[in-house]
């Protein structure tokens, strides 16, 4: 509906303005690791909505609504792939649940962000997504770089699982440009697709073998971004390698980020 369209396009534009230095708020992506229960997700969304409204002058808050999980080997791949979590793989049901949940969250007035993993599923949900991510395990993938170049929302690309920046920087450079590849249209036909390139891309520091949220790591990242002549906006993921997968460790990570920002670092524009 018009209300959802206004929310999504308005939030995308605000994120774009923020990425290009025209909005001085901090961009915050917050929410569960992945969605497994829509009812719990709506309960969470209602609580987050109050925070979203209270701090909207200083923070641009969107809800993390991840339906797909990249696996290092095997495991549950997320709500879209296996919505009943019983290895029945009712993907059609998963797509319907995911889309309905995104609509319900948007109707509350809360924008949503997600990770794009499967190259086909974005056709079913992207119109309700305000921001997207390419994860550490797929940052080097040509398919995902091409996908990012054609998505109509801002995209963050994570550093590699080992902590290296190269995959993310190369990915951003690739996503900035136009690509031609085979893909599915909205009518589910296979066709040659040509993308325009996505200039609303940025790096996400998620740590690796060691954290990379500290001041030295951030400065090293900024230097690398400048040398690559790409967007110098930095988002920091307080989880994953930066918290060594200990959720309570996210608090001192965020405190460090806040200290860096208050100390004058205006390249840190976002946190997860």
Question: What kind of feature is each model-predicted range?
Answer:
Residues 31, 236:
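Conserved, mostly hydrophobic/aromatic
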Residues 41-50, 245-272:
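A short alpha/beta connector and helix-capping loop motif
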Residues 1-19:
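N- or domain-start disorder-to-order transition segments that initiate the globular core
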Residues 23-29:
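Short, contiguous, helix-prone interaction/anchoring segments in small proteins
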Residues 58-213, 217-218, 240-241, 245, ...:
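Active-site-facing alpha/beta catalytic cores
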Residues 19-22, 49-56, 100-109, 193-195, ...:
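Acidic (Asp/Glu)-rich catalytic clusters
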Residues 38-50, 73-80:
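Glycine-rich loop at the start of a catalytic domain that most often binds anionic cofactors/ligands
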Residues 218-222, 226:
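Glycoside hydrolase catalytic-domain groove-lining segments
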């Amino acid at each position: 509906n018009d209300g959802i369209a206004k929310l999504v396009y308005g939030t995308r534009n605000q994120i774009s303005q923020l990425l290009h230095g025209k909005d001085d708020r901090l961009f915050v992506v917050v929410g569960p690791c992945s969605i497994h229960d829509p009812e719990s997700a709506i309960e969470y969304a209602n609580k987050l909505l109050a925070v979203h409204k209270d701090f909207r002058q200083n923070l641009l808050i969107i809800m993390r609504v991840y339906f797909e999980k990249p696996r290092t080997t095997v495991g549950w791949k997320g709500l879209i792939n296996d919505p009943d979590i019983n290895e029945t793989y009712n993907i059609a049901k998963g797509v319907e649940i995911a889309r309905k949940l995104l609509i319900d969250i948007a109707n509350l007035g809360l924008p949503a962000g997600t990770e794009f993993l499967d190259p086909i599923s974005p056709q079913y949900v992207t119109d309700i997504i305000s921001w997207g991510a390419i994860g550490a395990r797929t940052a080097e993938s040509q398919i995902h770089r091409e996908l990012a170049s054609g998505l109509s929302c801002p995209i963050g690309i994570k550093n590699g699982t080992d902590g290296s920046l190269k995959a993310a920087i190369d990915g951003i450079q690739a996503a900035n440009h136009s690509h031609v590849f085979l893909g599915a249209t909205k009518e589910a036909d296979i066709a040659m697709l040509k993308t325009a390139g996505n200039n609303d891309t940025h790096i996400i520091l998620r740590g690796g073998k060691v954290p990379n949220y500290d001041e030295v790591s951030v400065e090293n990242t900024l230097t690398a971004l400048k040398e690559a002549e790409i967007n110098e906006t930095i988002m920091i993921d307080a989880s994953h390698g930066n918290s060594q997968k200990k959720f309570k460790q996210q608090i001192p990570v965020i405190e460090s980020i806040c200290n860096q920002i208050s100390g004058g670092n205006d390249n840190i524009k976002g946190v997860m």
